[in-house]
Amino acid sequence: MNMNLPDVTSKQLTTASLPLKWVGMEGIALPITLAEQPSSSLSAKANVFVSLDKADAKGIHMSRLYLRLKESLTNEPLTMGALTALLQTLVSSQEGLSLAARLQLDFELTIRKPALLSGQFGYQTYPVSIRCEYINEKMNTELSLSIPYSSTCPCSAALSRQAMSDAIATQFSEESVSKEALLTWISSQQGSVATPHSQRSFAYLKLQLQHNELPDFSALIKNFEDVIGTPVQTAVKREDEQAFAKLNAENLMFCEDAARRLKQALENNEKISDYWFKVEHQESLHAHNAVVIDHKFPQGYDKL
C-alpha cells in the first residue's frame, strides 16, 4: 500500500556528509511487564536511539524503532534476553545505517509494604530506570533506583538527651526521686523537653550488573532498605508509629553513616560489577542538604 509513497530517508542524501552519535525518540508511552510481577502491567516511558553511521544518509528509519519497541516489549516479560534481542533488532532494522543502539525505560515499581506491628499494609512506589547500550556487538546495562528513608541526627539526639537530663535535674532537685513521680512527669507534656531533628532522606543508586542480568527489583530495593534500617512507612497505627520512633533511635545516622552502610552492601553484592550512589539528607535543621557521593573504582563510575 505504501509502495508508491515517497521515502525521503531512503532516496535522498544529506548535503553534509557527517555521522551522528545518537538519533531517535524520547518519552514513548509503553506498557511493560516484569518477570517478578508477570500478571501486572506497568506504565513506562521509553527513550530509544540508534547511531547514524552512514554519513551521507538523510536520516534513520524512525518509525521502525517505534514498531520494533512496541512489538518486543509489550508481548513478553522484561528480561535481559528480550532487551538484547530488541537492541539487535533496532540496529538491523536500519539496514546498514546504524551500528549501535541504546534504550532507556523509566517506570515506577509499586511494592506492597506491611506495617511494623499492626498487621496493616500499604503501597509505595519507587522510580526505576533501565539503560541499555548495544555497541560493537556488546550489551551493557545500567539500573537506577531512588530509595527514600528516615534519618535522625546523632548530634541532635545527644543534645536532646542532655536537655532531658538537665530538665530532670531541675524538676527533681532532691537526692532521691519517686519512680512514680518521675514517670508521671516524663509522660506529661512537660516531659517533652527536646526532640532530635530527623528528615526524609534519599539514596540514589546507579548499578551495573554482572552478566547483564536483571535483578528481582523488589528484593533488591528491600535489601537496601534493610541495610539502611529506617525505611519510610505506608499505612500506620499508633503502635507502628511508636515502633518507627524506636527504629530511628536505634539507627541514628549522619549521612556518612548511611553511605557506609550502603557502600558495604554494594561491595558485598557479587552481582554488582560497578556502582555510583548519592546519599541525600534533606535537613530539617538547615535550609540545605547533607550529601555523600561515592563510586566503586578510584577512576570514577563508567556510566552509560
Per-segment meaning from a language model:
Residues 1-304:
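N-terminal intrinsically disordered, cationic/polar leader segments
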